[in-house]
Regions:
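A short beta-strand-turn-helix
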Residues: 56-59, 64-85
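Conserved hydrophobic/aromatic "anchor" residues
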Residues: 65, 80, 89-93, 134, ...
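Active-site acidic short loop of glycosyltransferases
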Residues: 80-83, 114, 140-141, 158-159
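Conserved redox-active cysteine motifs that mediate thiol-disulfide chemistry
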Residues: 81-82, 89-106
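Hydrophobic beta-strand core positions in alpha/beta domains
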Residues: 86-88, 121, 166
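Structural microenvironment flanking redox-active thiols in thiol-disulfide oxidoreductases
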Residues: 98-138, 148-155, 190
Length: 198
């Protein structure tokens, strides 16, 4: 009996002596003080930075624009509704952009020529003369959009190229990617094929 009374007294003393902040809901603050922030790795920081520069995310409607093509004609993105569109931002000085473009003719334009697909590459921040010299050197003949003031690019992103925005038939972005990796390009081609099959 004495032991039981001592145990009850000890429990009562414990409750009386607990800090008031725990009773008043301050337990979260106490828990936060006990938590340790895990520093981000350099790779985590780089990925967060890349993601933050993407203004149009997957699931969003693609912002509409009108772009002047290399041949002087114009195309408005919304006029392509009903087609799957791959919007690609690139520049002639960008090595991964140039590497990605080497795969476009055979793996996109020729492959999907008889299907409702449009490849819309937009040169970011370059004048027509620069793109003309690049086309002459490479022999590319597919349509290329010009965005010398980066007005179109700034609707979609704040930094980094190459960038791809895969847009479905309703005008919704279903994939947004940064950079060029051969395996990711393969996956992109497969995704286009799947969208065209829907």
């Amino acid at each position: 009996m004495v032991l039981m009374l001592l145990a009850i007294c000890a429990v009562l003393i414990l409750f009386i002596c607990l800090p008031a902040e725990i009773w008043s809901g301050g337990g979260e603050a106490a828990a936060e003080e006990a938590a340790v922030e895990v520093p981000m790795t350099e790779e985590d920081e780089e990925q967060a930075d890349l993601a933050a520069t993407t203004l149009v995310k997957e699931g969003m409607m693609a912002p509409d624009f009108t772009v002047t093509l290399f041949d002087g004609s114009q195309v408005t993105l919304s006029s392509l509704r009903g087609r799957v569109v791959l919007l690609n931002f690139w520049a002639t000085w960008c090595p991964p952009c140039r590497e990605e473009l080497t795969r476009v003719q055979a793996e996109l334009i020729d492959r999907f020529a008889d299907r409702p697909f449009t490849f819309l590459p937009v040169s970011r921040g370059e004048e027509r003369e620069t793109v003309a010299a690049f086309r002459e050197k490479t022999g590319y003949t597919f349509a290329m959009g010009l965005d010398p003031e980066q007005a179109i690019y700034k609707l979609y992103a704040a930094n980094y190229i190459p960038r791809n925005f895969l847009i479905d038939r309703e005008g919704r972005v279903v994939l947004a990617s940064i950079g060029y990796e051969p395996e990711e390009f393969d996956a992109l081609v497969a995704r286009i094929d799947a969208l065209l099959g829907e």
